[in-house]
Design a protein with these regions (language model features):
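Alpha-helical transmembrane segments of multi-pass membrane proteins
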Residues: 4-10, 153, 231-238, 327-335
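Interfacial loop/helix-cap signal at membrane boundaries in integral membrane proteins
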Residues: 67-120
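Generic hydrophobic transmembrane alpha-helix motif, especially the helices
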Residues: 165-168, 172-178, 182-185, 195-232
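Hydrophobic, membrane-inserted alpha-helices
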Residues: 1, 121-129, 143-148, 208-212, ...
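Transmembrane-helix boundary motif in ABC transporter permease subunits
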Residues: 127-134, 146-157, 169-198
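Short amphipathic alpha-helical coupling elements at transmembrane boundaries
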Residues: 18-25, 102, 106-113, 146-150, ...
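Transmembrane helix recognition focused on a "late"/terminal membrane span
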Residues: 2-56
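Transmembrane alpha-helices
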Residues: 226-230, 248, 262-296, 318-334, ...
């Protein structure tokens, strides 16, 4: 074995040496940094050294190095402008925001009525049946045990409220996200425009974009749904674009050569081939939406998130852990239903 490894090392050394020699002899391959990069690096290095030396050698002589030069009025004026802009937007777009609120409330009220007013045994059986059909009998048994946990500990109604809010946000995100992803897959410039916006939606802390949502829609369930959509709605768009761009070009060319129309190409070729990846995006949207349950409770959403929030406020460790486990079980059940046998 030692001799074999030694021979492999000698052969590999010769091969790598030849490749390195070829790389050095090839003038078309750029080596090192460009002259402009060297000059910029030297220039900024000198600036850093000079100002750092001045600051630590004469700390009181050059005061502008201690604090960034600004004026308090700049922030006050900026705050005033933003508040004026929001007040104007609320007044001018009152009917627009009311329409959005009405649409969200309609879906949410229907789902809450469905999950809360329907007998628990019907919902229990339906969820177990869906999980069994999607992921198999073992997953159905597991989901039944998760639901039994919520019922025995008194979390049933809270869990149904949470699932209703989550399904509202996920449903709206999906029906808006998939068409948007289809449109972006054929419009690279538009996708390049909205991609930074989606990055902003996912990276910005929820407490920051919670402020304009409350300013436009107030506190309550509508604001909770919108906050959940902002954070959890982007994966379905990204995955739809990725899935449609990954459809083999030879398959599309074959369909076009047989006279397939754009609608036929989309519905019979692209979407069926892209469906597994799109469903992965749907799964990510559902699970990311569920992570906003506790944050949504800060703006008036009830459910399991409120239980966790109260446990944090009163340092009730037991209540927080039990409610957190219930949220985890909701996520696992939804994951099994959406993903099916892939995760079984």
């Amino acid at each position: 074995m030692v001799i074999l490894k030694l021979v492999q090392g000698l052969i590999a050394n010769n091969i790598l040496e030849k490749r390195f020699s070829y790389w050095l002899s090839d003038s078309s391959i750029a080596t090192g940094m460009k002259l402009n990069n060297y000059l910029f690096s030297i220039f900024f290095t000198l600036i850093i050294i000079i100002f750092t030396t001045i600051h630590y050698s004469f700390p009181d002589s050059v005061k502008f190095l201690n604090n960034f030069p600004t004026h308090p009025d700049i922030r006050l004026v900026s705050i005033s402008w933003i508040e004026t802009a929001f007040k104007t937007a609320v007044l001018k777009g009152d009917s627009f925001f009311d329409g959005i609120s009405f649409g969200i409330r309609t879906v949410l009220d229907f789902l809450e009525l469905l999950f809360l007013e329907t007998p628990w045994i019907v919902i229990f059986t339906l969820i177990v049946l869906l999980t069994t059909l999607s992921a198999g009998p073992r997953a159905g048994i597991v989901s039944g045990s998760f639901l039994a946990y919520m019922g025995l500990l008194g979390f049933w109604k809270l869990a149904m409220i949470t699932i209703a809010l989550l399904n509202t946000a996920a449903f709206l995100s999906i029906i808006l996200g998939i068409p948007l992803g289809i449109f972006c897959s054929t419009r690279p410039r538009f996708y390049a425009f909205i991609r930074p916006i989606m990055d902003f939606m996912q990276t910005m802390p929820a407490f920051v974009f919670m402020i304009p949502i409350i300013a436009f829609f107030g506190v309550g369930k509508v604001a909770a749904v919108l906050i959940t959509m902002i954070f959890g709605g982007t994966p379905v768009v990204r995955f739809t674009v990725l899935a449609l761009k990954g459809v083999p070009s030879n398959v599309r060319e074959a369909a076009i050569s047989y006279g397939a129309s754009k609608w036929y190409l989309l519905t019979k070729v692209d979407l069926p081939l892209a469906a597994p990846t799109i469903m992965a995006g749907v799964n990510q949207t559902v699970l990311l939406s569920l992570t906003m349950v506790v944050v949504a409770s800060l703006v008036g959403a009830k459910g399991l998130g409120l239980e966790v929030l109260e446990a944090l406020q009163y340092t009730n460790v037991g209540q927080g852990i039990l409610a957190g486990i219930a949220i985890l079980f909701c996520a696992l059940i939804l994951d099994k239903i959406v993903q099916g046998k892939k995760n079984s």
